[in-house]
Amino acid sequence: MGSRETPSSCSKTLETLDLETSDSSSPDADSPLEEQWLKSSPALKEDSVDVVLEDCKEPLSPSSPPTGREMIRYEVKVNRRSIEDICLCCGTLQVYTRHPLFEGGLCAPCKDKFLESLFLYDDDGHQSYCTICCSGGTLFICESPDCTRCYCFECVDILVGPGTSERINAMACWVCFLCLPFSRSGLLQRRKRWRHQLKAFHDQEGAGPMEIYKTVSAWKRQPVRVLSLFRNIDKVLKSLGFLESGSGSGGGTLKYVEDVTNVVRRDVEKWGPFDLVYGSTQPLGSSCDRCPGWYMFQFHRILQYALPRQESQRPFFWIFMDNLLLTEDDQETTTRFLQTEAVTLQDVRGRDYQNAMRVWSNIPGLKSKHAPLTPKEEEYLQAQVRSRSKLDAPKVDLLVKNCLLPLREYFKYFSQNSLPL
């Protein structure tokens, strides 16, 4: 079974079904889906599925109530309390809002933790924290080829049933609670239209003014169409599986434009439409006859040409990266034009400074992953930058890749073993 320490051995032919459609239909809609899903998933035996669907029949003693998160099962089973009145993450009864993915509540501190962890990914392409409670440590990895979610041992044992983690760990292939056609596993009940719920939760509870796009079901995801300005990011897109080497008409597309001086709206409309627009200042040490601010203004101009129509519902993302060349005034201007604050990304391994970039983007998760720098940290970073005449392209590519990982929730990706740069 795949975990953060154990690579997945599951067959990558599992078919993903439209679970939102099944969840919003009749109460019996899961029955035909169960049969269809099992037939289309030969790597997953029926008895393996039963393991994660069963709730523990072990009786709970009313005279010895448990503590901590163990209270969740006790309150639901013994005290008959609605699980919506209990925080799924910590077990407190001080519920602030609803959990967006599963039936249950969230207290205020856990709500903040959930928002911060929602779109954080590790280098292996999977989410960094548990999908339910946002804890780290050793996690079960969903082995559906189109899923990036992980779950902690404690959540599956408490919410599905004691011993569930051991049974999952013994399975050759495990598919998670958001991918299975069965909406209930023990106390864990997937919400209907959970992608809508997730967007509404982020837009309502998030600290920033920028809304996110609803994540896209795997079977609806389309190949991404990218416009890359000033720098070619084809290697990054291939490493993420968005572009295939020698890709035909079925793969993603990339339009690279190095000099946009004479580009006008009709050019962009002819090349497009696009799902992602990327731009950056020139790398440190590069010979260039234009000031760094020129790249920002040109990026903003081209971005206006590429924006979808206002009534369009398709996800559209943009990202502008500064190789720490913009002055303080330029940074303020960029924030005003792009209408979002910058985030500073650092690649520090041990005590060795590798690279850093400032990023303005509407891609979700960036602000929670990279906290603002203190003035002392900013001064140290600038000193490190001045000491390097030129940053290696692979190190820049790694930072770009980390920014684009959340887009796997929106667009089709192809190669399963393409993540390392």
From Swiss-Prot:
Residues 75-207 form the ADD domain. Expressed in testis, thymus, ovary, and heart. Gene3D superfamilies: Vaccinia Virus protein VP39. Keywords: Differentiation, Metal-binding, Nucleus, Spermatogenesis, Zinc, Zinc-finger. A zinc finger (PHD-type) spans 127-183. Changing residue 297 to A/E: Loss of binding to DNMT3A. Catalytically inactive regulatory factor of DNA methyltransferases that can either promote or inhibit DNA methylation depending on the context. Essential for the function of DNMT3A and DNMT3B: activates DNMT3A and DNMT3B by binding to their catalytic domain. Acts by accelerating the binding of DNA and S-adenosyl-L-methionine (AdoMet) to the methyltransferases and dissociates from the complex after DNA binding to the methyltransferases. Recognizes unmethylated histone H3 lysine 4 (H3K4me0) and induces de novo DNA methylation by recruitment or activation of DNMT3. This is DNA (cytosine-5)-methyltransferase 3-like. The gene is Dnmt3l.
